[in-house]
Amino acid sequence: MTSVSLGMPSAPPPVLAPRRKTRQIKVGSVGVGSDSPISVQSMTTTPTTDINATLQQIAELTASGCDIVRVACPSADDAEALPIIARKSQIPVIADIHFQPKYVFAAIEAGCAAVRVNPGNIRKFDDQVKEIARAAKDHGTSIRIGVNAGSLEPGILKKYGKATPEALVESAVWEASLFEEHGFHDFKISVKHNDPVIMVAAYEMLAEKGDWPLHLGVTEAGPAFQGTIKSATAFGALLSRGIGDTIRVSLSAPPVEEIKVGNQILQSLNLRPRKLEIVSCPSCGRAQVDVYTLAEQVTAGLEGMEIPLRVAVMGCVVNGPGEAREADLGVASGNGKGQIFVKGEVIKTVPESEIVETLIEEAMRIAEEMGEADGEDAVKGSPVVSVS
């Protein structure tokens, strides 16, 4: 069989816009800002007081590609759990603080990499910024000023009537000015809303007002399907213009699903190296094979692989050969058989019953070759299915 060169392209893939230039901060070992890759975050759903369960969920998130994790801290018992969690977590931990400013100081003392503060609901927050800034600077802790449409300050709500983009931005800029007034600059900002249109407008406005790193998020985005659409729409609009330095996809779903979606959004925009991608046609009356089943079986068979490989599963002769040729590995099916392509070359034709097995075997062979070339284990993670 002909040897075919595979792997990442020699030139970097194109992006829609250069990153907006921002100041650089650190969240533990992870850089956040225009000089660093865009990071993906999630938040644990376990009670923070259940240290073992929380650390287990953090381990699962880490394995799925999470860069930074946030944990809730609504009580003194939660604050007491933070030192162990921060010390044992494989990735930087952010403590999420509302209402009680004393927990901000507890989280900083506990060794959390960062603290998220909500100026809209922490009592007398503005009066304590000086002390928070000093403590954070002394411990090397960064801050996220997390403005949320659901918890704006009463004065701002009275001024604007509701959570408009202008209201969100005014709250964020005011709090940023207080930290900067006290010589503290290691913070990022979020201005979250559950409406992607308002959220996008707020971030665009905020991006014009300073060089702060921005944490993107659509708050209360909803169940998995709806939340994925909202987040992909909003993040795509902003990231394609260079706005955004770290993201959190909020879903009413297991946190690992948030990481899968976030990583896929970044990969789709060429903002993170592409990994295994399965391209499959949506099927139609021309299809001569069960494309749905083929795609599902190939996906299941390749679960656990994490390599820059595009696999095309096509069901007819219209787009099938072309898509299969464009992919690293693919099949164009019809008349009870499938033509197997590797980098545009037909390497064999197999009966329909052997398509899945053949694709998996070829993918494994390619993965092994790529792993040997890179000196790495290419079999880890899980593939992402994109239906075209």
From Swiss-Prot:
Keywords: 4Fe-4S, Iron, Iron-sulfur, Isoprene biosynthesis, Metal-binding, Oxidoreductase. It is an enzyme of class 1 (oxidoreductase). Binds 1 [4Fe-4S] cluster. GO terms for biological process: isopentenyl diphosphate biosynthetic process, methylerythritol 4-phosphate pathway; terpenoid biosynthetic process. InterPro entries: Dihydropteroate_synth-like_sf (IPR011005), IspG_bac (IPR016425), IspG_bac-typ (IPR004588), NO2/SO3_Rdtase_4Fe4S_sf (IPR045854). This is 4-hydroxy-3-methylbut-2-en-1-yl diphosphate synthase (flavodoxin). It catalyses: (2E)-4-hydroxy-3-methylbut-2-enyl diphosphate + oxidized [flavodoxin] + H2O + 2 H(+) = 2-C-methyl-D-erythritol 2,4-cyclic diphosphate + reduced [flavodoxin]. Converts 2C-methyl-D-erythritol 2,4-cyclodiphosphate (ME-2,4cPP) into 1-hydroxy-2-methyl-2-(E)-butenyl 4-diphosphate. SUPFAM superfamilies: Dihydropteroate synthetase-like, Nitrite and sulphite reductase 4Fe-4S domain-like. [4Fe-4S] cluster binds at C281, C284, C316, E323. It comes from Arthrobacter sp. (strain FB24). Pathway: Isoprenoid biosynthesis; isopentenyl diphosphate biosynthesis via DXP pathway; isopentenyl diphosphate from 1-deoxy-D-xylulose 5-phosphate: step 5/6. Its EC number is 1.17.7.3. Pfam families: GcpE. Belongs to the IspG family. Its cofactor is [4Fe-4S] cluster. It comes from the Bacteria. One of its GO terms (molecular function) is 4-hydroxy-3-methylbut-2-en-1-yl diphosphate synthase activity (ferredoxin). The gene is ispG. NCBIfam families: ispG_gcpE, PRK00366.1.
